[in-house]
UniProtKB/Swiss-Prot annotation:
Cofactor: Mn(2+)
Cofactor info, note text: Binds 2 manganese ions per subunit.
Active site, UniProt feature: K230, R304
GO biological process entries: proteolysis
Provenance organism: Mycoplasma genitalium (strain ATCC 33530 / DSM 19775 / NCTC 10195 / G37) (Mycoplasmoides genitalium)
GO molecular function, one term: manganese ion binding
Function: Presumably involved in the processing and regular turnover of intracellular proteins. Catalyzes the removal of unsubstituted N-terminal amino acids from various peptides.
Family: Belongs to the peptidase M17 family.
Keyword list, A-Z: Aminopeptidase, Cytoplasm, Hydrolase, Manganese, Metal-binding, Protease
Catalysed reactions, as listed in the record: Release of an N-terminal amino acid, Xaa-|-Yaa-, in which Xaa is preferably Leu, but may be other amino acids including Pro although not Arg or Lys, and Yaa may be Pro. Amino acid amides and methyl esters are also readily hydrolyzed, but rates on arylamides are exceedingly low; Release of an N-terminal amino acid, preferentially leucine, but not glutamic or aspartic acids
Record protein name field: Probable cytosol aminopeptidase
EC number: 3.4.11.1, 3.4.11.10
One Gene Ontology CC term in the entry: cytoplasm
């Protein structure tokens, strides 16, 4: 993306014009004042979707007059929203300018954008261009085939990406996980020839704050279902089961690159879930890192197992004061919220309100779903362990999974983000929630 270096006069220019709502129009010598569409002034998720759809149709050079958008907001009663509008435009542009991963011999051409804006907004533009770059990093890893991306490769990718940033990286290898007695993560890993990993990326930039936000990501680099193997269409796209890990790690690097004064750590639980000769089976009982025993009812409910140990690690070993996990956890989300909203579960109303504000500022639609002790009861019916990892009981499967995770938070507030229906759309990774997590961590910097 170019800043204040417009393309030639023959290029289209996008300006934002005022009406009862906001319109986006193109202006070019050969095609003047052609209206593209309208976007409600404060509906930033809709604004984001409209801009992305518009930019993806463009395969040419395009100038965007950001000053026209700023003036539009300043003249309106929603003048306080123009910073969010700028963020939305910049992250939409970086999303559309790049194809993060492709193995095509002739890659498709993307739009090239030059942004025109006043000097006083350059820092804001550059900040969110960086956020967009790390959204694209998450997308790149999401789209990479699982034969090229497994736990060891995932770790190396982030070690390289973080090499010049003020972060600390710690990698718990298989032997470390055994010493720690992370039985749930190790149990899922039993069927794979490749070892599990727990990747920890720490960024501490606010010594005056006692708050530490932990982002925990599910990193199943391929999910076959294990011994409860998936069939047909249910296995297609399971390379995206590591999306949560890619998203949380990318977010921490974005915060570090922009030197946001906050304390945050990413924890990525990495393994494959395969039906090898040594794979765990239904009826096995595993001991979690927090000491609880878990009976395996279904090996395809593996995400909550690896997350459970990672959440406990964030609470006990890293002294997190707030935990947010991101995971492609339950396929039911596609029926509940489709690809429009990400489902959010929270043990704390106050933390939910802060998260909702962050999502609004990021222009990402989220919807809170319920947690209730009744949802956990079917998982407590086992006579042989403290919990089962799943049940044949009908209804509220996504809420039940969230309640299972809450059993491992060690008293720390937990927000669970189920991105099963929003992580990838039309077989392309979206880097969903990188922007929201960035905004949430930035909120703590402003306290």
């Amino acid at each position: 993306m170019r800043i204040n270096k417009p393309f030639s006069d023959d290029s289209n220019t996008v300006v934002f014009v005022s009406s009862k709502t906001y319109g986006v129009k193109e202006e070019a010598a050969h095609n003047p004042n052609v209206e593209f569409g309208v976007v409600l002034p404060t509906d930033f998720p809709a604004f984001n979707r409209a801009l992305v759809q518009f930019l993806k149709r463009k395969k040419t050079k395009l100038n965007i007059n950001l000053d026209s958008l700023i003036e539009l907001y300043k003249k309106n009663e929603n003048s306080g929203c123009f910073h969010t509008a700028i963020k939305t435009v910049i992250t939409s542009v970086t999303f559309c300018e790049t194809t993060p991963f492709t193995m095509k011999t002739k890659p498709e051409k993307n739009v090239e954008v030059a942004v025109q804006c006043a000097v006083e907004y350059h820092n804001l533009v550059k900040e969110y261009e960086t956020v967009g770059e790390y959204v694209n990093l998450a997308r790149e890893l999401q789209d990479t085939p699982s034969d090229l991306l497994y736990s060891e490769v995932f770790v190396k990718h982030f070690e390289k990406a973080a090499s010049k940033l003020p972060v600390k990286i710690k990698v718990l290898k298989q032997s470390d996980l055994i010493k720690k007695k992370m039985g749930l993560l190790l149990g899922v890993n039993q069927g794979s020839e490749r070892e599990a990993r727990l990747l920890v990326i720490s960024y501490q930039a606010n010594k005056n704050s006692k708050e530490k936000l932990a982002f925990v990501g599910k990193g199943i680099t391929y999910d076959s279902g294990g011994m409860n193997i998936k069939t047909g269409d249910y296995m297609r796209g399971m390379k995206y089961d590591m999306s949560g890990a890619a998203i949380v790690c990318s977010t921490v690097l974005a915060l570090a690159k922009n030197k946001v004064k906050t304390n945050v750590v990413a924890v990525a639980a990495l393994t494959e879930n395969l039906p090898g000769a040594k794979a765990q089976r239904p009826d096995d009982i595993k001991i979690a890192y927090n000491g609880k025993s878990v009976e395996i009812d279904n090996t395809d409910a593996e995400g909550r197992l690896v997350l459970a140990d990672a959440i406990t690690y964030a609470a006990k070993d890293l002294a997190a004061t707030h935990i947010i996990d991101v995971a492609t956890l339950t396929g039911l989300m596609s029926y509940i919220l489709s690809t429009t909203y990400t489902g959010i579960f929270s043990t704390c109303d106050h933390q939910w309100e802060s998260f909702k504000k962050a999502a609004c500022s990021a222009g990402e639609p989220v919807w809170r779903l319920p947690m209730h002790p009744d949802y956990l009861k079917p998982l407590q019916l086992t006579k042989l362990a403290d919990l089962q990892n799943s049940t044949s009981a009908r209804g509220a499967g996504s809420s039940r999974a969230a309640c299972f995770l809450a059993e491992f938070r060690e008293g720390v507030s937990l927000i669970h983000c189920d991105i099963a229906s929003t992580a990838s759309i039309e077989n392309l990774g979206q880097g969903v929630l990188v922007r929201t997590l960035y905004e949430r961590a930035s909120q703590l910097a402003n306290k």
